[in-house]
Amino acid sequence: MGRLFGTDGVRGVANRELTAELALALGAAAARQLASGSAPGRRVAVIGRDPRASGEMLEAAVIAGLTSQGVDALRVGVLPTPAVAYLTGAYDADFGVMISASHNPMPDNGIKIFGPGGHKLDDGTEDRIEALVGDAGPRPVGAGIGRVIDAEDAADRYLRHLSKASTLRLDGLTVVVDCAHGAASSVAPRAYRAAGARVIAINADPNGLNINDNCGSTHLDSLRAAVVAHRADLGLAHDGDADRCLAVDADGNLVDGDHIMVVLALAMREAGELASDTLVTTVMSNLGLHLAMRSAGITVRTTGVGDRYVVEELRAGDYSLGGEQSGHIVMPALGSTGDGIVTGLRLMTRMAQTGSPLSDLASAMQTLPQVLINVTVADKATAATAPSVQTAVGQAAAELGDTGRILLRPSGTEPMIRVMVEAPEKDIAQRLATRVAEAVSAAR
């Protein structure tokens, strides 16, 4: 059996790989590891979920695991992942648990665990939790068993926190918000309206089965059409758990996480808020971001893929902005993890501050043509290190020289290898990416 924890918690098809039994065992193991050193008194874990149908089953199982170890479960209901992270700190809980598979299809689900203060766990802590899975250990009885408490004020507390993200009123801005029929369906429109924007919410009617179904940050067509139809200033797309945000301008053109980071980095540097004039991003960010930041005199620190690694670098260097091309944007002053709604508020604040349309702000970065091909494989390690694959990568890199780059990356959550190529021309990137992808496919 491989490692349970991937780059973003434990994921799998609900009731197949991610069973109620495993969820119970993970809840109990997390309780033993993360609440064992707590001060005297009741131990508490915050637990939330996105609206997918299997979340109810898994929430019940995790709560059973928590309470079996004497930990009280503070249930916050359907809220975004960053809300659970924030509330873990706000309620002074020992740790937090979010049940979500983010942008994945509805049949999938996942379990993310946050430590004290709402920070994602490091690899070592995850390994220690995993080692305890299946080891029930001592169990309390009687009054020592944990209780379940519903946090009635959770959404309102999170909304008050979100209000800090917008330093200017957004009156006059019209935004279309695609909530992906996910965890943001209630709170995102409320947050944007509270800041003054005129909000048109789409895909905001979750029924447990329609999350991420041709909508949200991975399917932007309906958002583009709605922005143009309503003559909105911009559109914002969240994923199922609202830890990411992508945007489209008034003409429906994509403004991805790289462009958003450039816009926010320039704004924060202008305000004296960009610590050490440094932006943290991952190896997936487009070369155009690096060129734009170099031109502006801003240093770029690069990490592995996954917002947890961005957060680790932000904390290590005491930096103030980081993120991913996929739309996970992290601002430590406003949260311990990526928050799509905070990102949307900050982006609109910059528009209100400058009076500029999003297209003008995003033009500070020119994207190099990029091709990304996902290749399904049986064994990620074997396929990635095969001599034939390494030869194909070397040949492509030699052809590109310093005019582009190639990246071969095993997915942290799915059985696939991602082949990414950037080049001066799209046809060059497509040709080289296809060649390498064919080598990976043949080696799988």
UniProtKB/Swiss-Prot annotation:
Mg(2+) binds at residues 102, 239, 241, 243. The active site is at residue 102. The modification Phosphoserine is found at residue 102. InterPro entries: A-D-PHexomutase_a/b/a-I, A-D-PHexomutase_a/b/a-I/II/III, A-D-PHexomutase_a/b/a-II, A-D-PHexomutase_a/b/a-III, A-D-PHexomutase_C, A-D-PHexomutase_C_sf, A-D-PHexomutase_CS, Alpha-D-phosphohexomutase_SF. CDD domains: GlmM (cd05802). Keywords: Isomerase, Magnesium, Metal-binding, Phosphoprotein. It comes from the Bacteria. SUPFAM superfamilies: Phosphoglucomutase, C-terminal domain, Phosphoglucomutase, first 3 domains. One of its GO terms (cellular component) is cytosol. GO terms for molecular function: magnesium ion binding; phosphoglucosamine mutase activity; phosphomannomutase activity. GO terms for biological process: carbohydrate metabolic process; peptidoglycan biosynthetic process; UDP-N-acetylglucosamine biosynthetic process. Its EC number is 5.4.2.10. Belongs to the phosphohexose mutase family. PANTHER family: PHOSPHOGLUCOMUTASE (ALPHA-D-GLUCOSE-1,6-BISPHOSPHATE-DEPENDENT) (PTHR42946:SF1), PHOSPHOHEXOSE MUTASE (PTHR42946). This is Phosphoglucosamine mutase. The gene is glmM.
